[in-house]
Swiss-Prot record:
Signal peptide range in chain numbering: none
Function: Could be a nuclease involved in processing of the 5'-end of pre-16S rRNA.
Keyword check for Ribonucleoprotein: no
Protein name: Putative pre-16S rRNA nuclease
EC number: 3.1.-.-
Lineage, highest ranks first: Bacteria, Pseudomonadati, Pseudomonadota, Gammaproteobacteria, Alteromonadales
Naturally occurring in which organism (per UniProt): Idiomarina loihiensis (strain ATCC BAA-735 / DSM 15497 / L2-TR)
Broad class of the protein's primary localization: cytoplasm
């Protein structure tokens, strides 16, 4: 696996980020507008044509105690639709506190003007991709 595309699912905006497992780095991409959780599938198709992902990861919104919430099932449905449409493997990644971390990171970069909705969603997607890669990739042993 080398290219991973991650999604921070929302009913109005879906954050997107791309990660490279070879370098263990990720970058935010433009968020995709959604209508009641349904994205413009042609935009996602173009995104996949450009980046050629081998793995998809969808953030799984959970309550702080780990239980599911109403948005959890919608995110799972979105992931299942991605798999059905494009035939790519889809993993689900716990996304608790990713939006909070994304806001903190963006605010540190440029204050309130950086806190646009799409930017926060894609920064959250970046965190989802990084968390996925950190859990998936083998850890290196730097000891001698």
């Amino acid at each position: 696996m080398s290219t991973v595309i991650g999604f921070d699912f929302g009913t109005k905006s879906i954050g997107v980020a791309v990660g490279q497992t070879i370098t263990a780095t990720a970058s935010p991409l433009a968020a995709i507008t959604a209508k009641e959780g349904i994205p413009d599938w042609q935009l996602i198709e173009k995104l996949f044509a450009e980046w050629q992902p081998e793995q998809l990861v969808v953030g799984l919104p959970l309550n702080m105690d780990g239980t599911e919430q109403p948005l959890t099932q919608k995110a799972k449905k979105f992931g299942n639709r991605l798999h059905g449409r494009f035939g790519l493997p889809v993993a689900f990644q716990d996304e608790r506190l990713t939006s909070t971390s994304a806001r903190e990171s963006l605010f540190a970069e440029g204050g309130f003007r950086k806190l646009k909705k799409g930017a926060v969603d894609s920064q959250a997607a970046l965190i989802i991709v990084e968390d996925f890669m950190n859990g998936y990739l083998p850890k290196s042993d730097n000891s001698l």
